[in-house]
Structure formats: C-alpha cells, structure tokens
Amino acid sequence: MASSFETTLFPIVQTINEYLSNYVLVILLLGVGIWYTIKTRCVQVRCFKEGWNRVFGNITLNGKKSGGGMSSFQALATAIAAQVGTGIIVGVAGAILTGGPGAVFWMWVISFFGMATIYAEATLAQETRIVELDGTIKGGPVYYITTAFQGKFGKFLAGFFAVAITLALGFMGCMVQSNSIGATMETAFGIPSWVVGIVLIVICAFIFLGGVQRLASVTEKVVPLMAAVFLFGGLIVLVVRIKYIPETFAMIFRYAFEPQAIVGGGFGYAIRLAISQGAKRGLFSNEAGMGSTPHAHALANVKNPHEQGTVAIIGVFIDMFVILTLNALVIISTLYAGDGPLAGCGAAALSSTFNKTNLAQCAFGTVFGYKAGSMFVAICLFFFAFSTILSWNLFGKINMVYLFGKKSANVYTLLALIFIFLGTTMSNDLVWELSDMLNQLMVIPNAIALLALTSHVVKHSHTPDRLSGRENG
C-alpha cells in the first residue's frame, strides 16, 4: 500500500514528466537533430555507407582493445545494448496502441534526425575524452559539457547531468529493467521473481567486477544474438502474414496524416496523438541527444572522432529502422491489418482489452500460439533488459566516479546490485516516474552543450581526413 508521501509525490512527478515529454524534450531534441542535419550537410546520409563498412566490413570489428577501451564494434554493441531495452517491445506497443499505426511513421522521422544528433554526441565524446597513464579512458557528456562552458556554470551543468544519469540509469533505470525481467519470467515460465533476482545479480556481479573489458566482451556477443533471435521470430510472423504487408505499410503512411477519429477529440486530436506518441517513442528508444550512449562511444579506440560518429549512426539505424520497425510491422500486420482484432483502428484502441504489455505477446501469439508467443516475447525481453542493465550500469559508474572519485566505484556497484534485486521483487510506479523524470532532465544540459559545440562537430564531419592524427590506445 502506497504511503501518503508516495500518494502526494506521484501526481506531481507525473505532471512534470508529461510537460517535459510533450513539450520541452520533443522540441529540444527534434530541434537539435534538425540543426545538426543542416549544419553537417546531412551527415547521416553522406556517411552512412562509411559507418556501415566500419561496422560490418571488418575494418574495426577486431580493432584495438588496449587499456580501458574497447574496439569500435564493442562500443557500438554497448551503445545498442543501452538503446534496445524493454521499450523496444513495450514502448513501441504502447505508442501504436495510443497513437495508432501512424505513430510508426513519426518514429522514423524523429530517428532520421536523431542519427545526426548521435553523430555529434559520439564525435564530441571522442574529442574530449581523457586517456590516463594507466590506459583508463574517461569520457562522456560531462567532459564535453565542461569543454563547452568554462568555470562554475560548466561544472554545475556537468554535475547536474552526472547526478541525473547516475540516479536515472544506474539505479532506478536498472531497477525498472529488472522489474520487467522478473515479471515476464514469472508470467511466462512460472519462475518466482525473487529467484530471478538472485540469478540476475549473480550474473551481473560477475560482469560488473570484470570491468569494461568483460562487459564489452559480453555485449559484443549478447547484442548480435538477441537481435538475431528477435529478427528471426519477427520474420517468421511477417512471412505468415505476408499478404497483409502492403496494407500494413499503407496504414502507417495513411494514418500518420489521416487517422480515423476513434478517440475523443476528433480528427485533429488523432493526428496530434499519432505525432506525439511516435515522436516520444522515437526520441526515447534511440536515446539520441539524451547523453547515455556517448559514454560507450568515448571508449572506442579509433583513429579520429569522425570514425566513431559514423559508427554511432549505424546504432540508431539498427535500433530504430531494423528492430523497432520489425516489431511494429509484426504488431500492425497481425492485429490491425486484414482480419486482425483491431482492424480499422487507425488512431487508437484504448477501449480494447489490449495494453502495451500484452500487445506484442498477442501479435506473436497469432502465429506461434499465445503461450509460445508469450514465451518468445519473454525471452527477448530478458535479453533486451539484461543488456540494457549492463550498459546503463557502466554509464552510471562513469558519472559516479566523476562526482566522487575512483573509490566510489565499489560502493556504486554494491548499491546497483541491491537496486537490481529489488526491481525484480517489487513494483513501484513512483520509481518508474522518477526514473523517467531524471532521464528527461539529463537531456537539457546535454542538448545545450551539443548546440554550443556545433563548430567542433561540423569540423569533424566536413574534414575528417585532416583530423585523423590522433591514435588512441
């Protein structure tokens, strides 16, 4: 039973979150994405092939991993692990359920501009990182924030960001992810959540205590595996429902601009709903501009910042245009198109018996059977949430050390493991809302620094060859 304190605080935090997500963040992050798309002359298109070759062409796949760094591929895998969390299934389902199939179109639009933003984050993280004498690499938004703003103001912004991300991702964020793991494992397989919690913290402790190198070694294996499993299952569904694929794409584009007025408020409200849901999910799923993934990209051992910037672009592409899109196509082709139970629901289906937690299960269940579909989604959610915990823990640790020094690392790890276990055994809506609020607040100093350092990013995007003298590691 919620205490009076929780009852009082919950609506306040919820109101702040709604204001931030509906107004401040959409405008700020979309604005930064459009700004960098223009200033870099559409770097996400110009340099897409270059980034693709770096990731899949064996150029940096087996790159140097000396000191405290990673290969470029490991850094990308760690970044994708953070991006592809439970939101890639539950969040997308919620956006479609609320905003209709048209929300997917706006996810694509936002993600296109987000690719330019994440290029800026990765290049700045590389440019401002610090390599210590023992090979340890320190990098992330706190370092380019203090580069953008000198003196007390810069330290304040960096400190604000560090506190927000440590709490939002390192503690409460990991708690939210472990909660999803515990709930899905108990529902799908009947495993008690406390057992899941114990197993989870044992595995996490082994990886955390192994440092950056062990984490990188795990993510470079887990991320391709989890993506392959989800893509394989999704493709099976799409093959079975192949005759509805043209209708699915038609619904995405048609309802992005002409949604049916299913929800109260009429035509205009339905369009705003599709745009807002698609925009928010697009922003929060790819994490471009939020300041999380630059921590991973800063650790990559590459010749120049531009290289890792192009690799970061591919991360958003894989997250949004491959995994997220596949999930959206599965949901729409099975539930909205043809003879689906939500057929004709162009805007939203809030009055139905579906919710964001069971929509994906029902979608996969139409082909696999509900029980098998639930188990498949549960397995995928486990991998997605587990990989996110690993990356978010690293990002939080980097900022904890920035705030309190190296001696705080072990204390942080112990606290993180406690929060991970608690997350599997309890559900607290206030924790979810506080995590979302801090997650959104950390965007503000990061976005301000990104705009202030535009000239640095433009320099790298236009003249990478002349800036390739730095060798890391």
Task: Please describe what each predicted stretch is.
Residues 61-97, 124-127, 133-142, 146-148, ...:
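Alpha-helical membrane segments and immediately flanking helix-loop junctions
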Residues 32-37, 110-135, 142, 146-179, ...:
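Helix-loop-helix module between adjacent transmembrane segments
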Residues 42-70, 94, 100-103, 116-152, ...:
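Flexible loop linkers connecting adjacent transmembrane helices
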Residues 28-35, 39-52, 161, 178-185, ...:
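Membrane-interface loop-to-helix entry segments
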Residues 119-129, 133, 235-251, 259-266, ...:
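Extracellular/periplasmic helix-exit of transmembrane alpha-helices
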Residues 6-8, 39-44, 88-92, 101, ...:
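Transmembrane helix-loop junctions in multi-pass membrane proteins
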Residues 113-121, 198-212, 223-243, 281, ...:
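Selective recognition of specific alpha-helical transmembrane segments in multi-pass small-molecule
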Residues 1-86, 96-103, 114, 421, ...:
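N-terminal alpha-helical transmembrane segments of multi-pass membrane transport
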